[in-house]
């Protein structure tokens, strides 16, 4: 991409920084990811349906999982959440099944939203357990003290202090007051949804005060246009593009590697970087696969330097194209 290439006017907010960053867990925060975050925030704030489309491998699903904190949510156990991070979950990520029906879509979305509600209620449940256990132990000690008095019979056993029941009812009322925290539903692989399932998705959107994002391949916007009732509710459209050559080059020059991949510390020569940029075309999934194969080829040849020949050998073991 030429440095002097004209820049077309942007209809959506642009990220404050175009620098590609990596997080501690290896996630690549590209400029496209930051645009997706701003797009998602807008859908959430304005309660619109957003349509996100892009070729495979550019990072749509990864960005959606990152935004919704799906990885943290997947390990949540309501009854054993000691390690649960103190963050608010308000985004549902739903991946459409290959075979789907309206009832199944409604059931899956309902369960996902109930899970967010259970997380929102859990702090109250923990507090209630602690307070009620303290009251119970206090009452138990008091009953024991009375029963151990000289001349006391089992018939003299005192009744439980009504404060326990009042406290229990108080916390039950607090839990019932907790509303559904869902403010955004992200539907990945929306291309799989049939007409009736899309109508069910629209019904879910209409029934709640929330935003929604449909993620799919290029062409999904034309398919959705055939459903006027759904199409009329779309407020934002975002195209998830491949990484620019300069961004991929900057990523490689900082010796970025996918999670689980270890490459020599000697770095990459400009020729190798240029070859990787040209081979992958900004496709993040393809870049990840290619670097994984580079690691394998280095091990097979007991080499310590990444050369153009090593990259070519790694390329030959892959089907280069839109992955």
For the regions a language model picked out, list residue spans one by one.
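Pre-Walker A adenine-sensing motif
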Residues: 33-44
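Mid-core helix/loop region of P-loop NTP-binding domains shared across ATPases and GTPases
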Residues: 86, 100-200, 204, 243-250, ...
């Amino acid at each position: 991409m030429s440095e002097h290439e004209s820049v077309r006017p942007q209809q959506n907010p642009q990220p404050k920084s175009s620098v590609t960053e990596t997080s501690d867990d290896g996630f690549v925060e590209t400029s496209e990811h930051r645009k997706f975050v701003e797009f998602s925030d807008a859908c959430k704030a304005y309660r619109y349906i957003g349509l996100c489309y892009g070729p495979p491998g550019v990072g749509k699903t990864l960005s959606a999982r990152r935004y919704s904190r799906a990885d943290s949510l997947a390990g949540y156990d309501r009854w054993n959440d000691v390690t649960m991070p103190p963050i608010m979950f308000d985004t549902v990520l739903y991946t459409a099944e290959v075979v789907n029906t309206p009832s199944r879509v409604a059931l899956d979305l309902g369960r996902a939203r109930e899970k967010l509600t259970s997380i929102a209620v859990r702090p109250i449940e923990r507090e209630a357990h602690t307070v009620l256990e303290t009251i119970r132990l206090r009452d138990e000690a008091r009953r024991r003290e009375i029963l151990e008095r000289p001349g006391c019979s089992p018939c003299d056993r005192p009744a439980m202090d009504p404060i326990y029941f009042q406290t229990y009812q108080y916390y039950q009322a607090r839990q019932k007051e907790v509303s559904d925290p869902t403010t955004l539903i992200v539907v990945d692989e929306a291309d799989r949804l049939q007409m009736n399932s899309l109508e069910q998705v629209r019904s879910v959107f209409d029934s709640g005060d929330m935003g929604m994002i449909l993620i799919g391949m290029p062409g999904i916007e034309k398919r959705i246009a055939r459903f006027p009732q759904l199409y009329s509710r779309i407020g934002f459209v975002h195209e998830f593009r491949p990484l620019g050559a300069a961004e991929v080059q900057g990523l490689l020059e900082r010796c970025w590697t996918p999670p689980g991949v270890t490459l020599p510390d000697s770095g990459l020569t400009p020729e190798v970087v240029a070859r990787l940029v040209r081979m992958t075309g900004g496709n993040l999934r393809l870049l990840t696969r290619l670097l994984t194969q580079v690691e394998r080829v280095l091990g097979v040849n007991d080499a310590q330097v990444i050369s153009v020949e090593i990259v070519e050998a790694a390329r030959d073991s892959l089907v280069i194209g839109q992955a």
